[in-house]
From Swiss-Prot:
<feature type="signal peptide">
    <location>
        <begin position="1"/>
        <end position="20"/>
    </location>
</feature>
<keyword id="KW-0732">Signal</keyword>
<feature type="region of interest" description="Disordered">
    <location>
        <begin position="111"/>
        <end position="139"/>
    </location>
</feature>
<dbReference type="GO" id="GO:0005576">
    <property type="term" value="C:extracellular region"/>
</dbReference>
<protein>
    <recommendedName>
        <fullName>Secreted RxLR effector protein 108</fullName>
    </recommendedName>
</protein>
<keyword id="KW-0325">Glycoprotein</keyword>
<keyword id="KW-1048">Host nucleus</keyword>
<feature type="compositionally biased region" description="Polar residues">
    <location>
        <begin position="393"/>
        <end position="405"/>
    </location>
</feature>
<keyword id="KW-0843">Virulence</keyword>
<feature type="compositionally biased region" description="Basic and acidic residues">
    <location>
        <begin position="429"/>
        <end position="442"/>
    </location>
</feature>
<feature type="glycosylation site" description="N-linked (GlcNAc...) asparagine">
    <location>
        <position position="47"/>
    </location>
</feature>
<comment type="function">
    <text>Secreted effector that completely suppresses the host cell death induced by cell death-inducing proteins.</text>
</comment>
<feature type="short sequence motif" description="RxLR-dEER">
    <location>
        <begin position="48"/>
        <end position="65"/>
    </location>
</feature>
<feature type="compositionally biased region" description="Basic residues">
    <location>
        <begin position="122"/>
        <end position="137"/>
    </location>
</feature>
<comment type="similarity">
    <text>Belongs to the RxLR effector family.</text>
</comment>
<feature type="region of interest" description="Disordered">
    <location>
        <begin position="386"/>
        <end position="442"/>
    </location>
</feature>
<keyword id="KW-0964">Secreted</keyword>
């Protein structure tokens, strides 16, 4: 056994040396022969905790058994790993090639990913198309304002193309000057309150604000809290205003309530907005009367939107100037608190219209017909006939047209008046399905109650030219029954305008 032991030990040492030489880690070289090296190995074995070596440190049998089992395990493990080593050796060149080709594969992978991304872009764009369409539909408010301004420009051009425009312009120049002088507040009329606090100026509504219905207007009535004193306040207010303004108790009550609103900031702006809506209300009431005549209404709808836009805004300003005049006088003198000033007519700084109303014996003209001419139809001709002259400050300022007659086209194809004379004095607005047509809560015409005859349209006519007529929102006084004043500009004066228009739905819902 000892011989075998030494042989195995020598083989083990030689094998270890060869393996170490291949791995570039040579073992320590002994200067003695193989036995010396074997002894060195054997002496180190007892120090290990091997099985059977605890009983005797020099027990060679135990040492041999331990070495044999150790070597057997090593051989078995080596044999088991030989196939794996062979496979690794075979696949090593392939692995080297794979490493060399790895950059190319990465490049191909990157190109493939890029191609997939480029293919997916059209799909993403297709998905985003509806969002872009929705964004395009949301037009900014500035663009809408520009469109409304363009409507106003087109309206002016459209009216300028009509053949009767020159005649209408010449017939209304003097009347417009008189209207402005008579109704617009000025510095001379501001006695108690500074003129800067008055409400004045022209207004214009956008086309969108004209597209409202007729069903949201309730009748205006005298408020319950004003019923006891309305006669006194209305009488004092009527004395302060010109007779031709024909202030009604309902209008007096509404102006009275406006000044009682608890508004500390921007009261002037809010009051102006309310006056504009009141004026628009009167225009819409007139249009509702026009709608009753189907033939005339169909002709009105055929007018282009720009022309109707200009007509409605002109009528709006006529009503608005009257409301402004009444508001400024009521707010300045407060007849509900102070009554009538004792110096009315005696003070040189008092309103010229007030002095005229007290001292002048000249008949006052109707507020929406402040013109000194009227249309007289004879046969197929409509001529301007001279009427009485109207003075505003003594006999210095006159507002009358020259006596020269202006001939117009034949009225054979003229339309009937848009608002026919009413036979009864009660023309109140129905109160069923009452809804407010306006957004602002301060502009609501409340409190309103049914049964008030606030709209009277006797002998009132509407001009499609819109340059000098309006809807009259009250009854004409009996003093003028014998000398009925007709509107100076009627539909009969514009036959060619109706011929040149195109069909369309017009302003909705009109």
């Amino acid at each position: 056994m000892r011989g075998a032991y030494y042989v195995l030990t020598a083989l083990f040492v030689v094998t270890s040396s060869d393996i170490a030489a291949e791995s570039d880690h040579p073992l320590h070289n002994f200067n003695h022969h193989v036995i010396t090296a074997g002894n060195a190995v054997v002496k180190a074995l007892p120090n290990r905790s091997l099985r059977g070596s605890r009983d005797g440190r020099n027990d060679l049998a135990n040492e041999e058994r331990s070495i044999s089992s150790f070597l057997a395990n090593m051989i078995d493990e080596g044999v088991a790993k030989l196939p794996l080593v062979a496979e690794i050796i075979k696949t090593k060149p392939l692995a080297a090639k794979a490493v060399k080709q790895k950059p190319r594969a990465m490049k191909k992978k990157f190109r493939a990913a890029k191609a997939v991304e480029e293919k997916s872009r059209p799909a993403k764009a297709a998905k985003k198309t509806p969002r872009a369409a929705k964004a395009a539909k949301k037009t900014p408010p500035q663009a809408k304002v520009v469109d409304e301004i363009l409507y106003g420009v087109e309206a002016t051009k459209e009216m300028g193309k009509s053949e009767e425009y020159g005649v209408l312009k010449a017939a209304t120049e003097g009347a417009d000057q008189a209207l402005k002088k008579h109704w617009d507040p000025s510095r001379e009329t501001a006695v108690i309150v500074a003129p800067s606090r008055d409400i004045s100026g022209n207004v214009i509504l956008s086309l969108r604000k004209w597209k409202v219905g007729f069903n949201g207007m309730r009748p205006m009535v005298v408020l319950d809290k004003h019923k006891d004193n309305i006669d006194r306040v209305h009488g004092a207010f009527g004395t302060l205003c010109d007779k031709n303004m024909q202030i009604t108790p309902v209008e007096t009550s509404y102006l009275w309530s406006m000044l009682d609103w608890n508004i500390e900031k921007n009261f002037k702006k809010k009051h102006k907005q309310t006056l504009v809506r009141l004026a628009q209300r009167y225009v819409l009431i007139g249009l509702r009367q026009v709608k009753k005549d189907r033939k005339v209404w169909n002709q009105w709808k055929k007018l282009p939107d720009p022309l109707k836009f200009g007509v409605l805004n002109y009528l709006l300003n006529l009503h608005y100037q009257r409301w402004v005049r009444m508001y400024n006088i009521f707010r300045r003198y407060r007849p509900d608190q102070n009554g009538v000033p004792s110096t009315l007519g005696g003070n040189a700084n008092i309103n010229r219209a007030l002095a005229l109303q007290k001292h002048s014996k000249v008949r006052s003209v109707f507020p929406y017909e402040p013109f000194d001419v009227a249309w007289a139809s004879k046969g197929r001709r409509s001529v301007l006939s001279k009427r009485s002259r109207r003075t505003f400050d003594g006999n210095t300022d006159t507002a009358s047209l020259p006596s020269k007659q202006l001939k117009t086209r034949s009225s054979e194809s003229s339309m009937p008046p848009l608002i026919e004379s009413t036979t009864s004095g009660d023309d109140s607005v129905p109160t069923k399905e009452i809804k407010s047509s306006f957004d602002d809560p301060k502009s609501a015409f409340a409190p309103f109650k049914p049964g008030d005859d606030f709209v009277h349209t006797e002998n009132s006519r509407l001009s499609f030219g819109g340059l000098s007529s309006a809807f009259v929102p009250y009854r004409r006084p009996n003093v003028h029954n014998s000398q009925s004043l007709t509107s100076p500009i009627t539909v009969s004066s514009m036959p060619s305008l109706m011929k040149s228009t195109t069909s369309g739905d017009g302003l909705r819902p009109y």
